């Protein structure tokens, strides 16, 4: 059996992500993580790399942001043997929630989490498919901290390294890890 290095896994993952020009609007080069999901070897490699990085790190919960964060966060939580907590748009969670609003380029949005999903002392790993400006992840970290959880780490499949998200989260005391980096412009 051939041993695959982490660098080879990262290259496989990067090569599985399709770039779509002029989507969703002219001038944007969209990085399509759904093409990674279509490749079972690349998808498995992404989960394995994330799980291996955080195994034995003391993580007690994994939080995934709507919606593609669920696709990576839930399997990583299973691999780590910890619970998975979804962060969703308003009105999608059935139990009592708390919410956090955040600014977008043109307007604002809101995220919610079940108010009983995180306990004081939980060491939470946040996972999403992509880090761009960091607004969604900043709101997610604020929700977790309001419930008493600690967030030291956030992991992504893709980091659009020139859009400022990593710096934004680092400023909140969150260490960012991504499997692949692309320019955002």
UniProtKB/Swiss-Prot annotation:
One of its GO terms (molecular function) is adenine phosphoribosyltransferase activity. The keyword Iron does not apply. Pathway: Purine metabolism; AMP biosynthesis via salvage pathway; AMP from adenine: step 1/1. Disulfide bonds: none annotated. Transmembrane segments: none annotated. The keyword Glycoprotein does not apply. Keywords: Cytoplasm, Glycosyltransferase, Purine salvage, Transferase. It catalyses: AMP + diphosphate = 5-phospho-alpha-D-ribose 1-diphosphate + adenine. It is found in: Cytoplasm. One of its GO terms (cellular component) is cytoplasm. Its EC number is 2.4.2.7. Belongs to the purine/pyrimidine phosphoribosyltransferase family. Homodimer. This is Adenine phosphoribosyltransferase. It comes from Pectobacterium carotovorum subsp. carotovorum (strain PC1). The gene is apt.
